[in-house]
A protein has these predicted regions:
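Conserved class I S-adenosyl-L-methionine
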Residues: 2-50, 64
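Class I SAM-dependent methyltransferase SAM/SAH-binding core
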Residues: 56-58, 64-114
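Short amphipathic alpha-helix with an adjacent loop that forms part of the alpha/beta core around
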Residues: 113-121
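A conserved beta-strand element that flanks and buttresses the S-adenosyl-L-methionine
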Residues: 128
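Short catalytic micro-motifs in class I SAM-dependent methyltransferases
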Residues: 131-132
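A short glycine-rich, Lys/Arg-flanked "PGG" loop and its adjoining helix->strand segment in the class I
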Residues: 142-154
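C-terminal alpha-helical "lid/dimerization" subdomain adjacent to the S-adenosyl-L-methionine
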Residues: 161-225
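Core SAM-dependent methyltransferase catalytic element
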Residues: 230-250
Length: 250
């Protein structure tokens, strides 16, 4: 796990097409409970009961979360933000058939300037993020959550599907084993022929591992509460995979 004292940003690896292709083709489909995480996101958004007219997807990757939101709210205007051009290219392809067409924004969540790039589309009824914010130092995570809160409409919902820190190395090892088992099952289903040992070696030595700055979900929920979010909770958690968030008070 990377610490905040590191001087060199490690998440720049996600700007490379090779890593993006490897993740989208060989990893993302093997994430445990991925469908359930998206279902939880949609249920929480629906429970707010307010019209969903504008949505933002931060660290959007290939747009999988936006695709799910627009399937439920087809008239919504979507804004997708990522600093990785290969990810944005994949998102454009995934969402090419959407009307109204989404806006794709190349911006870095590590710096507050991203807010200026989306401010004209605010306020947002829903802001989501999936497996992106854990690349930021904790101080920046907290600041980003405040920026998100300021961009939400009254009653608007923020949902973060995220890789979070375990409380001990023992729990982390269980989480890693579960992830490796899930990836192995995914590749076996595709007929890839990789052994569990090969999958484990690739997972342990993956090039993006150093980019992770994980924080406990409990701490992140506390940050949201301190920033004024309401109804903050962890809605789903299996080992290091969590869905959490809160609402801007109406």
């Amino acid at each position: 796990m990377r610490t905040e004292t590191d001087m060199v940003r490690q998440d720049e690896v996600w700007k490379g097409a090779a890593l993006v292709d490897r993740f989208l083709d060989g990893v993302r489909g093997g994430i445990p409970f991925a469908a359930e995480q998206i279902d939880v996101m949609l249920r929480v958004v629906a429970a707010c009961g307010a019209p969903v007219r504008r949505v933002a997807d931060l660290g959007c990757g290939d747009g999988i979360l936006t695709r799910a939101l627009l399937a439920a709210y087809p008239a919504a205007a979507a804004t997708l933000v990522d600093f990785s051009e290969p990810m944005l290219t994949a998102a454009r392809a995934r969402l090419a058939d959407r009307v109204p067409p989404p806006r794709f924004v190349a911006a870095d969540l590590a710096h507050s300037v991203w807010v200026e790039a989306v401010a004209d589309r605010a306020p947002f009824d829903v802001v989501v993020s999936g497996y992106a914010i854990h690349h930021l130092p904790d101080a920046r995570k907290r600041t980003l959550y405040g920026e998100i809160g300021a961009l939400l409409a009254p009653g608007g919902m923020f949902v973060n599907i995220e890789h979070v820190a375990s409380r001990s190395g023992w729990i982390e090892a269980i989480s890693d084993a579960a992830m490796i088992d899930s990836l192995h099952a995914f590749h076996t289903t595709r007929g890839a022929g990789k052994s569990r040992e090969q999958i484990a070696d690739e997972y342990v030595h993956r090039p993006d591992k150093a980019a992770n700055i994980l924080a406990p979900v409990e701490a992140q929920c506390d940050w949201l509460r301190a920033l004024g979010f309401a109804d903050v909770d962890c809605f789903f958690k299996v080992f290091e995979l969590a869905v959490f968030g809160g609402r801007r008070p109406a």
